[in-house]
Amino acid sequence: MRMLLGFSFLIALCVAFIFTSCETTRVAGGGAYHVTAYKPHDPSKVVVKVSLSKENIYVMEGDRCLMGVACSVGISSKPTPRGHFTIYRKEEDKRSGSYGFRVQGDRVVPAEAGANVSGRYVGYPMGFWCEFAPAYGFHQGFVHPTPRTHGCIRLHGEAAPKFYALVHNGTPVHIAETQPEDASIGPKVQRVDDSRAPDPDPRVMVSSAAFQKPSGPLLVE
């Protein structure tokens, strides 16, 4: 019972940390990180543009920018695919099928899905998943100032649920080294750096507490 109470307290503490870190992440120049996302007039006109060189996402409705945010893209050996795609699968509480953890009783150890490691496999949380190519998607995660992912596109916890609300199955996605919006919108995008943020406790990452649920409206009229 004492162990159960201790673990429950740990989960509560880590959940508080996850939510607090999303609210108080600092941006270049100081201040808390906050993303404003505007409700589209016509959801069928929404288009997503990704600039790999700037590591920016622009969610557009014609010439209107609904949301412009920093992101993390793939490293050179595992690049984010370039080209024209569409969102075709959304999953709010997705877990990775490739890498994550093995649960060994009270121990939780990092492990790839196919590794010869004992225990029950639980994939790494990839909340607010929006898939645009097989095994590639936008999802919540730490955002770094340099390419960091295995090809997916990570959004900060402040931005991921808003992106999820803006796109739907069929939303076009254009990924290129540069985008026309780099010159007009890019300089206004807040930079965020999670590189110094500590990793959450693995025991929390294998629980439902790993998935944040936003409160309040996501999109501004």
Model-identified regions with their sequence ranges:
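Short amphipathic alpha-helical segments with coiled-coil-like heptad repeat character
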Residues: 2, 65-66, 169
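Exported/periplasmic cell-wall-interacting domains
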Residues: 22, 27, 100-221
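Bacterial N-terminal signal peptides
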Residues: 8-20
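Generic anion/oxyanion-binding catalytic loop in active/binding sites
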Residues: 11, 46, 149
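Short, structurally constrained coil/turn elements
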Residues: 16-18, 81, 167-169
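Cell wall/extracellular polymer interaction/catalysis modules
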Residues: 22-105, 109, 114-121, 127-128, ...
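Bacterial N-terminal signal peptides that target proteins for export
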Residues: 1-9
